[in-house]
Swiss-Prot record:
Its EC number is 5.6.1.7. It catalyses: ATP + H2O + a folded polypeptide = ADP + phosphate + an unfolded polypeptide. Transmembrane segments: none annotated. The lineage of its organism: Bacteria, Bacillati, Bacillota, Bacilli, Bacillales. PANTHER family: 60 KDA HEAT SHOCK PROTEIN, MITOCHONDRIAL. It is found in: Cytoplasm. Belongs to the chaperonin (HSP60) family. Forms a cylinder of 14 subunits composed of two heptameric rings stacked back-to-back. Interacts with the co-chaperonin GroES. Its main location: cytoplasm. ATP binds at residues 29-32, 86-90, 413, 476-478, 492. InterPro entries: Chaperonin_Cpn60_CS (IPR018370), Cpn60/GroEL (IPR001844), Cpn60/GroEL/TCP-1 (IPR002423), GroEL-like_apical_dom_sf (IPR027409), GROEL-like_equatorial_sf (IPR027413), TCP-1-like_intermed_sf (IPR027410). This is Chaperonin GroEL. One of its GO terms (biological process) is protein refolding.
């Protein structure tokens, strides 16, 4: 296919249009007086949201060069979301500011490589200062404040704080849709381990890329399954029950995996395969934990058991299993409460006895998974549109709170970024590197300016006043007052602010050093040719192979 190529100034200008289009759509959502964005959906009602990454992912531009610029900034939002789970709008605002300022200087003749070094130096200094002015998060009230700021809802803040109190800061918290109008917390017994599905074709929800099994059987073995004949007898018994099955094995590959995927796609049989968690002896112990939790049995040659002779009685059961690319969560296993309690006490005793810090940490992880349970936040709303929007906000709030527990908190509302300006000004740089530092200095003001703009105020006046105030004093756009942000409960997790800044700086530096952009040339008669009629699909749907 022929290509279109643009060079230097022309290329960067085209991409900048895309950057501005995406960033302008995202940044209207920033701050307590930020607005919403409505996204068209092919099916069902439109989605109304103020979640930066959700908006960024939806934007596709007709011009290929502009679209590449938009996708670069969407990558900033997506990466920040992956690392910190929140802060995507801030990251987008920072990236746009750095790119616009940088482009002015490159157009004036500055060396992009020198600017890049300056941006990297300034970002490193800003991150170091952010960590220096941060405070550890302490107590339920602080956790509730972080969650409330992220979701713009005090009730959500309290619910998330309670959930973390019930299952621990590292506990498993999932978010589901409720049939009622209110948002409630429910703690159910469950276990999560860090292994995902063996094939993406096993997913049942393509939007979230997760496989959800309701009321499944659980087959647990320490063997590698390569031939479907090994598990066919027990799978046929499961098929007769018309229930799905989760297969936990050392590995599922080759013909066995292909057959499971094929039958899943045909709708004949719903099975999801995952690798067993852990390694060596720890793997055997974790499989035993899962077996006790689900009321099943580990099919292992150590006990003289063979897959071919396994029956449905040796399988575990659960109310629900959710499998993502990286994790598997088993909810409400059907195990005997006495056996589960006995296993928990056994693990507690092992924690007391072991002298190895590593072993102690791993035992405590297993104990938390077995005894901690899973907190389920059931999101309710009057309409489906409101529910989706509320669910996205709660997901952001939960991620933000976890990030705060992990690395601490700083003043929110863009205040912390203004507070680090003094440290960035002290960076030793000359020439084009100094220009790069100045680009970051200007960008650090942008979140406060945008929050003020969304509240109908002049941002530059507020920024200058904040520079003269002591560290931690910021502008509360909700009330129009200058307050100590931490004491007022307007907080941002360090991890969120840091990730937003680092990702914005990274993409901006790459953008400014771009000298050529290559895109596919659009075909003149694309879609012009008529498609012939599709022949009928022969053959019925055979049963399991």
């Amino acid at each position: 296919m022929a290509k279109d190529i643009q060079f230097s100034e022309e290329a960067r200008r085209s991409m900048l249009k895309g950057v501005d289009t995406l960033a302008n759509a995202v940044k209207v959502t920033l701050g307590p007086k930020g607005r919403n964005v409505v996204l068209e959906k092919k099916f069902g009602s439109p989605l109304i949201t103020n979640d930066g990454v959700t908006i960024a992912k939806e934007i596709e531009l007709e011009d290929a060069f502009e679209n590449m610029g938009a996708k670069l900034v969407a990558e900033v939002a997506s990466k920040t979301n992956d690392i910190a789970g929140d802060g995507t709008t801030t990251a987008t605002v920072l990236a746009q500011a750095m790119i616009r300022e940088g482009l002015k200087n490159v157009t004036s003749g500055a060396n992009p490589m020198g600017i890049r070094k300056g941006i990297e130096k300034a970002t490193a200094a800003a991150v170091k200062e952010l960590k220096a002015i941060s405070k550890p998060i302490e107590g339920r009230e602080s956790i509730a404040q972080v969650a409330a700021i992220s979701s713009a809802d005090e009730e959500v803040g309290q619910i998330i704080a309670e959930a973390m109190e019930r299952v621990g800061n590292d506990g498993v918290i999932t978010i589901e849709e409720s049939k009622g109008f209110s948002t409630e917390l429910e703690v159910v017994e469950g276990m999560q381990f860090d292994r995902g599905y063996a094939s993406p074709y096993m997913v049942s929800d393509s939007d979230k890329m997760e496989a959800v099994l309701d009321n499944p059987y659980v087959l647990i073995t320490d063997k590698k399954i390569t031939n479907i004949q090994e598990v066919l007898p027990v799978l046929e018994q499961v098929v007769q029950q018309s229930r799905p099955v989760l297969i936990i094995a050392e590995d599922v590959e080759g013909e066995a995996l292909a057959t499971l995927v094929l039958n899943k796609l045909r709708g004949t049989f719903n099975a999801v395969a995952v690798k067993a968690p852990g390694f060596g002896d720890r793997r055997k112990a974790m499989l035993e934990d899962i077996a006790i939790l689900t009321g099943g049995q580990v099919i292992t040659e150590d006990l003289g058991l063979d897959l071919k002779s396994a029956t449905i009685e040796s399988l575990g059961r659960a109310a629900k299993v959710v499998v993502t690319k990286e994790n598997t969560t088993i909810v409400e296993g059907a195990g005997d409460p006495e056996q589960i309690s006995g296993r928990v006490n056994q693990l507690k005793a092992q924690v007391e006895e072991t002298t190895s810090e590593f072993d102690k940490e791993k035992l405590q992880e297993r104990l938390a998974k077995l005894a901690g349970g899973v907190a389920v936040l059931k999101v309710g709303a009057a309409t489906e549109t409101e529910m989706k929007e509320r669910k996205l906000r709660i997901e952001d709030a939960l991620n933000s709170t976890r990030a705060a527990v992990e690395e601490g908190i700083v003043a929110g509302g863009g205040t912390a970024l203004v507070n680090v300006i003094k440290a960035v000004k002290a960076v030793d740089a000359t020439g084009d590197e100094a220009t790069g530092v100045n680009i970051v200095l200007r960008a650090l003001e942008e979140p406060v300016r945008q929050i003020a703009h969304n509240a109908g105020l002049e941002g530059s006046i507020i920024v200058e006043k904040l520079k003269a105030e002591e560290v931690g004093v910021g502008y509360n756009a909700a009330t129009g007052e200058y307050v100590n942000m931490v004491e007022t409960g307007i907080l941002d997790p360090v991890k969120v602010t840091r990730s937003a800044l680092q990702n914005a700086a990274s993409v901006s530096a790459m953008f400014l050093t771009t000298e050529a952009v290559i895109a596919d040339k659009p075909e003149e008669n694309a879609g012009g040719a008529d498609m012939g009629g599709m022949g009928g699909m022969g053959g019925g749907m055979p049963g399991m192979m």
